[in-house]
Design a protein with these regions (language model features):
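A residue-level marker of the well-folded mature domains of exported/periplasmic proteins
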Residues: 1-226
Length: 226
């Protein structure tokens, strides 16, 4: 197993080519890498590629590619209810890195959950336009608090989400994390005070699903091309 952590989009392909050249057969990456993964799947038909947290038309999926996707709307529904229940202003915010079909599913679930708890709740939503711009995210949240009175914030924004936590700490408002236990992460970080404003995190347990997929590979039950 080799892990790569390249964050520059123009370096994604080089990173994957490196591991292919080193003899790795299975390549696993998130939906951020979809275009590169599909390109390499055609160029390296003997390799197999697993794209995590993505969905697309089955007709467009090569035979050596598998997708793992989730019902993120369901977890977001629950934290939407939590956000509405904790809000004192009656305004909650959901801020994302970029608008994609998967992210839209997060947002829809959050909105549905908040409105199920309180039909009169107001919801503001914005996209930073990047997964790696915490400064812009922080400014966005501060503006939403000032202009819209938002007082509970949910982030689905990758590394940009750090700016939401910083804003909530400054504002004294609640934040909700995603994908990992961000309370635990910040509690052990150089900024443990950020943990104090995190209500909870919406987890999809991506790691568990990848392990489960490879158990199917080992048993000859994995499905490719879908």
């Amino acid at each position: 197993v080799e892990c790569g952590d390249e964050t520059k989009a123009d370096k994604y392909e080089d990173m994957m080519l490196d591991v292919i050249d080193e003899g790795y057969h299975y390549i696993v990456a998130s939906s951020t890498f979809r275009d590169v993964m599909l390109k390499l799947a055609k160029e390296y038909p003997e390799n197999q590629f697993i794209i995590v947290d993505d969905s697309m038309d089955e007709a467009d999926i090569p035979d050596n590619v598998a997708l793992i996707f989730y019902a993120q709307n369901e977890g977001s529904y629950i934290v939407g209810q939590l956000a509405a229940g904790m809000s004192e202003s009656g305004v909650v915010a959901v801020n994302v890195g970029m608008d994609t079909p998967v992210i839209a599913d997060f947002v829809t679930g959050f909105i549905d959950g908040a409105q199920a708890y309180d039909p009169d709740i107001k919801i503001v939503k914005a996209a930073v336009g990047s997964w790696t711009d915490p400064a812009k995210m922080k400014e966005l949240c501060l503006t939403q608090a000032r202009d819209k009175q938002a007082d509970v914030f949910y982030q689905v924004a990758g590394a940009s989400g750090a700016g939401l936590f910083e804003a909530c700490k400054e504002l004294g408002t609640w934040a909700i994390g995603v994908d990992s236990d961000q309370y635990a992460y910040y509690k052990e970080s150089e900024n443990p005070e950020l943990a104090d404003i995190i209500l909870t995190s919406m987890l999809k347990n991506v790691g568990d699903s990848v392990v489960a997929f490879f158990e199917k590979v080992e048993n000859g039950e994995a499905e490719w091309g879908k």
